[in-house]
Amino acid sequence: TYQWFCDVFNVFGLESNFCNVQFPQKLQSLSLTNQLMNAIWSSLILGLIISFPYVLWELWKFISPGLHKNERKKSKGFLFITSLLFFAGVLFSFYVIVPMSVYFFYHFEITDTIQNNFTLSSYISMVTNTLLGVSIVFELPVLIYFLTKLGLITPSFLKIYRKHALVVVLLLAAIITPPDVASQVIVSIPIMILYEVSIYVSRYVVKKQEKSL
């Protein structure tokens, strides 16, 4: 992944710290059962990620009897879209967010007198929390759809706070990425695209509701 970042930056003639990334220190296991428990926990999280479409399917089968026929047809499309966004979030997190976060936290130091020694548990926790967190963020268009249906969100509201959302995204990107603009842009663009898609989704819902009146 770091080599890919390096190659991308080189294409645009930009210098990058990713071209010479080294992690000489090894992760530490501080208890007898630590490696086993982390292996089990990682397997559970991986199983949850892989089984996400099946969990959605089972949830849909539970609520589908209470839906109208046309609603059942549309909800099948939501199963696909929700699963697609979830796995897109997993891939983006695993190949972009996690490597950048690891690089940042590994090299961050307040003073030279403090040495960073990372445990296996902290690493696994950071990776799993990031994977699940980013995957949930990628469900933003689906969330906006339902909030608009309930009348809690409008397209105009999302447009008004677009600049605020951009500032928040850039601040978060600046925190978890190395101090270069290119890295921040790589992280920010997909999230802002999701925000723009959410505006379109909200507008679509409002227009459809107006036609049905």
Protein language model regions, located:
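Membrane topogenic/interface segments and analogous intrinsically disordered interaction regions
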Residues: T1-L213
